[in-house]
Amino acid sequence: MEANHQRNDLGLVALTMLAQYHNISLNPEEIKHKFDLDGKGLSLTAWLLAAKSLALKAKHIKKEISRLHLVNLPALVWQDNGKHFLLVKVDTDNNRYLTYNLEQDAPQILSQDEFEACYQGQLILVTSRASVVGQLAKFDFTWFIPAVIKYRKIFLETLIVSIFLQIFALITPLFFQVVMDKVLVHRGFSTLNIITVALAIVIIFEIVLSGLRTYVFSHSTSRIDVELGAKLFRHLLSLPISYFENRRVGDTVARVRELDQIRNFLTGQALTSVLDLLFSFIFFAVMWYYSPKLTLVILGSLPCYILWSIFISPILRRRLDEKFARSADNQAFLVESVTAINMIKAMAVAPQMTDTWDKQLASYVSSSFRVTVLATIGQQGVQLIQKTVMVINLWLGAHLVISGDLSIGQLIAFNMLSGQVIAPVIRLAQLWQDFQQVGISVTRLGDVLNSPTEQYQGKLSLPEIKGDISFKNIRFRYKPDAPTILNNVNLEIRQGEVIGIVGRSGSGKSTLTKLLQRFYIPENGQVLIDGHDLALADPNWLRRQIGVVLQDNVLLNRSIRENIALSDPGMPMERVIYAAKLAGAHDFISELREGYNTIVGEQGAGLSGGQRQRIAIARALVNNPKILIFDEATSALDYESEHIIMQNMQKICQGRTVILIAHRLSTVKNADRIIVMEKGEIVEQGKHHELLQNSNGLYSYLHQLQLN
């Protein structure tokens, strides 16, 4: 009745869904009590105030249909008649709109005409204030500004060294001018000796300072690299499980590897070339003193370099994007192939896999070759501009010398100075591919670093839990346009109760436990432990107090002891052994040559499936969790190992709330209560013998199938 009443106020329904989309929990009745004063539903003003009270930033705008693809979605389409709906996605290519019908509680795809018929031009954009802060601090080139400020002393020293290098670079052409115009004309050998010694000293200082600058600069950029690498890994592990489920492993690895491109850029010559370019105004002043005409030729060439770069950069960026996409495909396919090597060998499909790899590799090589060709064209264009300027300067300079406006020494000095100006420009022009590549790398890496983590401000770390669990009016789907996985699930589990959950595949059994671990937040309803809403709880605090054993568990390439004591490496050995005995793992571990110090190999490859599963059970038990989840945990065990586990089940369950998910009904028949699920709903519950009495029930049907 309450759900139907809430469904009548579509504004309240929309607010609830948008708040939960932004990981904010709310009580609809409390919102209704505070803001729906006349009982007619939330008005526009009341809706905006209610959103503000939830730390949401909501803005009412009027937007033409043709510009809807530019707004941040999902957004609420506000209707004066109260028939509000959510706009989830705009498909501009096919003129279609993915919406969410709040009345029917289902996603809808509308054509252009259908959308125009119901759209009144009013939109409410919603974002969380935490995400606004995250967007302001997003990872891009500006991320390096605080790092530069942090190491400003080192960069200031680099700047000072660069100034001295430019002064030395200025002195050398002057020495050559003196030699050409004075020493050679007047045969001044003593002056020549002095200039030679001075020039040697300048060269030595220049080499030392240049090496010192490179060392100091590389040292500081290495620190920034360490900070970025550490930040990246911390952020990666803090991302919600949905981030990884929606992306290929190889694609994520490829994005993380883009850090290498940024590292090479930071420690390369590009940034020092920028510093050298900044001091070019000093050389221009001296060059102007020698010859304004020749200086104007040099100045006139600079826009040519810029225009050439502007012309070719967008093309290169598209080619680099394509190259990255092909590289990510290769990375994903390689990871998938190595991970599934047993299946590939067993099915003898290596030729087919090789054929697919060859095609993908050819596609990558082709895209890489196109990048190389374009980069070569760009570099040759730069060389053409440089050679053209050199010819013009030679012709004009010779005319000035012949007419007596310039001496030979001054012409040589001018050419040396112009070389000092053009050299960093050419280096940057030749490194423009690196700039483009780094820009792509920063964007790709930003996909990881700009994704919101699970850690939100204001999350509560509550006292040690007791084990009471409540699922209230739970409705959940993995994506807005995906089918409903859980629908109106209500379940109370008492502290210390052993609950079995059974049902057909896809009935929502495992999804229920994922909500309990706060991997996801329900679309509607609440998950509570000891009366505390998990949407408000710190995920790390919660998961440390829940033990989970899955059907396929992953062991790290460490010793058995380290795998069991993963959450607390300093754990006493007695606790590790006790947990291993409970899990039925101690006996086979003791028979190994190195016992608990045996390295299990990558993903536990050195152990059998049953052995890996028992170690995983020991790992879940070692922290003495108050809530224990067995999700098909014994399905991979042989009968002897399963018998050992079932014998110890009374000890395992003692003082804990236990949830057993199983297809084999023998695993759950001794549970205090058995929950039967079908199509996301609870259809039966009771003890084993009680459920068998209902001959028309699903549990009885599954029991008969297993008996037969």
From Swiss-Prot:
GO cellular component: plasma membrane; type I protein secretion system complex
Domain annotation ABC transporter: ranges: 469-704
Start and end residues of each ABC transmembrane type-1 domain: 155-437
Enzyme Commission number: 7.4.2.5
Transmembrane segments: 159-179, 192-212, 270-290, 296-316, 389-409
The record's note on its domains: In LktB the peptidase C39 domain, the ATP-binding domain (NBD) and the transmembrane domain (TMD) are fused.
SMART domains in alphabetical order: AAA (SM00382)
Function description: Part of the ABC transporter complex LktBD involved in leukotoxin export. Transmembrane domains (TMD) form a pore in the inner membrane and the ATP-binding domain (NBD) is responsible for energy generation.
Protein name: Leukotoxin translocation ATP-binding protein LktB
Organism in which the protein naturally occurs: Mannheimia haemolytica
Reaction catalyzed: ATP + H2O + proteinSide 1 = ADP + phosphate + proteinSide 2
Subcellular location: Cell inner membrane
Pfam families in the record: ABC_membrane (PF00664), ABC_tran (PF00005), Peptidase_C39 (PF03412)
Binding site for ATP: 503-510
Topology in membrane: Multi-pass membrane protein
Class in the EC hierarchy, top level: translocase
Keywords: ATP-binding, Cell inner membrane, Cell membrane, Membrane, Nucleotide-binding, Translocase, Transmembrane, Transmembrane helix, Transport
Family indicated by similarity: Belongs to the ABC transporter superfamily. Protein-1 exporter (TC 3.A.1.109) family.
Example of a GO MF term: ABC-type transporter activity
Main localization of the protein described in the UniProt heading: membrane
